[in-house]
A protein has these predicted regions:
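Flexible inter-domain hinge/linker segments at boundaries of tandem extracellular adhesion modules
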Residues: 1, 32-37, 104-122, 151-157
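Surface-exposed loops/turns
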Residues: 8-9, 80-81, 128
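Ligand-binding face of N-terminal immunoglobulin V-set domains in extracellular IgSF glycoproteins
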Residues: 12, 16-18, 28, 58-106
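Extended serine/threonine-enriched, polar tracts that run as long, contiguous segments within proteins
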Residues: 134-149, 156, 165-184
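Short beta-strand segments of immunoglobulin-like
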Residues: 1-8, 120-126, 138-139
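Aromatic sugar-binding surface patches on proteins
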Residues: 53-59, 63-74, 168-184
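Structural beta-strand segments of beta-rich domains
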Residues: 11-15, 130-134
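N-terminal V-set
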Residues: 22-58, 142-163
């Protein structure tokens, strides 16, 4: 099974399940979120595909593709608090063996920043010992981005940071996402 560790609410999420039935015949592929079935593919029944309502799961049927060796589902309209969870692909074979194999991936859903953070207040060069005063603002995200400072690709130890103030506020027009500003 392939699935993202973190899925972005700004994009659809794709889940893939590949399997080798060897000499056995595929009976069904089922997809679950938190032990609730939301999708079923059964190649020998009509209809082949069945979808079931599960909170936080919205299937994009045009992104679904299943056959005898793989099953891909595409989920859309992800939300952080409802689409997070344990996603499982379960594959079963026909009689007489009725073998069952499953794999689960925990997926975190977040709204990732669409842009790089903006830093203002810097000058072109600094000499050793100079004081640096700058402001870093992240673009909206949920949860709020964690601001980490680097100089010459080296992370700055927080004991050398004097944080003047930090603001974290909700941008209602952006769907309740958070923007963080750090003044140092």
């Amino acid at each position: 099974m392939t699935a993202p560790i973190v899925a972005d609410t700004n994009h659809d999420m794709e889940l893939n399940c590949r399997f080798d039935m060897e000499s056995e015949e595929l009976y069904a592929v089922k997809w679950y979120k938190d032990d609730h079935e939301f999708f079923r593919y059964m190649p020998h029944q009509q209809p082949h595909i069945m979808a079931f309502p599960v909170s936080g799961v919205h299937l994009a049927l045009q992104g679904t593709d299943c056959d005898e060796i793989h099953c891909k589902v595409q989920l859309t309209k992800l939300t952080r608090h409802h689409s997070d969870g344990a996603y499982r692909c379960e594959v079963s074979s026909e009689a007489p063996t009725f073998r069952l194999a499953a794999e689960t991936h925990n997926i975190t859903v977040a709204t990732l920043p669409k842009e790089k953070p903006a830093i203002v207040g810097l000058v072109e060069t600094y000499n050793e010992g100079d004081m640096l005063s700058a402001t870093c603002t992240s673009s909206p995200s949920d949860p709020a981005a964690i601001v980490t400072w680097f100089i010459n690709n080296q992370q700055i130890d927080t004991k050398y940071l004097e944080i003047e103030k930090m603001e974290c506020y909700i941008i209602a027009a952006a769907g309740g996402e958070l923007r963080q500003t750090l003044y140092v």
